[in-house]
């Protein structure tokens, strides 16, 4: 930027300050009280608002995730499943739906969610049967239980 004379340079500095002030006041227009008119108060309020806005972006993700989990928990309990068992068995069945989609299904597509709950419940029952086995101990293992014949 080239300034040909001192008056032009001074004039430019003044206009720069004016536009800088206007930029801050533009962000402060919706604030209450003197914070939307007085530059000194507006600078503090706008800075504080920007800091909170930055922090809130990460908090929003956390809040939405807890909301989705609460909705899925409530919907899965209607079908007789707890949330951890429901999610774990869906993962074992290779159903790759995230929590947002599951929460939306629970609200807007209850029949679809019911079928997912049935799938999860069936997988859980299969796991119990596999864990129990046939009820006999394998050969060559000493048990503390004394068998009397």
UniProtKB/Swiss-Prot annotation:
**Keywords tagged on the record:** Mitochondrion, Ribonucleoprotein, Ribosomal protein, Transit peptide
NCBIfam families per UniProt: rplT_bact (TIGR01032)
Compartmental location: Mitochondrion
* Pfam families hit by this protein: Ribosomal_L20
Q: Which domain of life is it from?
A: Eukaryota
Q: Share an example GO biological-process annotation for this protein.
A: translation
Where does the transit peptide start and end? Answer: 1-9
The entry describes its oligomerization and partners as: Component of the mitochondrial ribosome large subunit (39S) which comprises a 16S rRNA and about 50 distinct proteins. Interacts with OXA1L.
Task: Write down the species.
Answer: Bos taurus (Bovine)
Q: Which GO terms describe its cellular component?
A: mitochondrial inner membrane; mitochondrial large ribosomal subunit; mitochondrial ribosome
- Identify its protein family: Belongs to the bacterial ribosomal protein bL20 family.
What's one GO MF term for it?
structural constituent of ribosome
Kindly provide the name given to this protein in its UniProt entry: Large ribosomal subunit protein bL20m
């Amino acid at each position: 930027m080239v300034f040909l004379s001192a008056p032009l340079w001074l004039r430019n500095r003044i206009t720069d300050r004016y536009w800088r002030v206007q930029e801050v006041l533009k962000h402060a227009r919706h604030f209450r009280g003197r914070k939307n008119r007085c530059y000194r108060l507006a600078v503090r309020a706008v800075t504080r608002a920007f800091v909170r806005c930055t922090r809130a972006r990460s908090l929003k993700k956390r809040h939405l995730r807890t909301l989705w989990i609460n909705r899925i928990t409530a919907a899965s309990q209607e079908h007789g499943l707890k949330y951890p068992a429901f999610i774990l068995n869906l993962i074992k069945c290779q159903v790759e739906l995230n929590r947002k989609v599951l929460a939306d299904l629970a609200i807007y597509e209850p029949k679809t969610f019911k079928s997912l709950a049935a799938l999860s419940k069936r997988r859980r029952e299969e796991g119990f049967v596999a864990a129990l086995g046939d009820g006999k101990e394998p050969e060559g293992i000493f048990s503390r239980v004394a068998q009397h014949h």
